[in-house]
Amino acid sequence: SEINHKELNGMQKGAWLEVLKGQFPEKAKDEIKILDIGTGPGFFPVILAEAGYKVTAVDYTQEMLDTAKRNAGNLCERISFYKMDAQNLEFEDDVFDVVISRNLTWNLKDPKRAYEEWCRVLKPGGKLLNFDANWYGYLYDEEKRLSYEEDRKSVESEHLDDHYLCTDIDRMEK
């Protein structure tokens, strides 16, 4: 999709790569075993494979894995793709140096079970990097609400598209 393409070619790609690399063990790239859970369109595996890492990517749906493979293109040789449930991983214990996930936890039926699984497949001393967001914290926190309103003003003053304006919270909470 256009969003995937922008993200994979935008400035945030380098920022994400630096954040991730800063958490990796100090050993050769080929020796670091990385698992991306809920890979979606394959953002993390693609940027990591471009940087010379080998990555295992899992997702619950074949459609997302197919999208990730398309996005990876010739980088697929550095990425292993598996259809798998994030809450019931089919890997042995203590396999990965790093487990990463982005924008997945809030979609899971049983996040506690997922975290148990993710920790199970991590090697002792491994790193679990979970990036998730509370997109609607501004509805419950006055400080976040003020920040949200300031962001809306900034977007308007820069004449940018504001995708937050059409969110129907009442419908989502039903």
Which residues does each PLM region occupy?
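Conserved class I S-adenosyl-L-methionine
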Residues: 1-30, 43-47, 67, 127-163
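A short glycine-rich, Lys/Arg-flanked "PGG" loop and its adjoining helix->strand segment in the class I
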Residues: 112-124
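A short SAM/SAH-binding and catalytic strip from SAM-dependent methyltransferases
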Residues: 98-111
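Class I SAM-dependent methyltransferase SAM/SAH-binding core
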Residues: 35-37, 41-88
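Short N-terminal helix/helix-N-cap motif within the alpha/beta-hydrolase-1
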Residues: 63, 108-113, 138
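Short alpha-helix
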Residues: 174
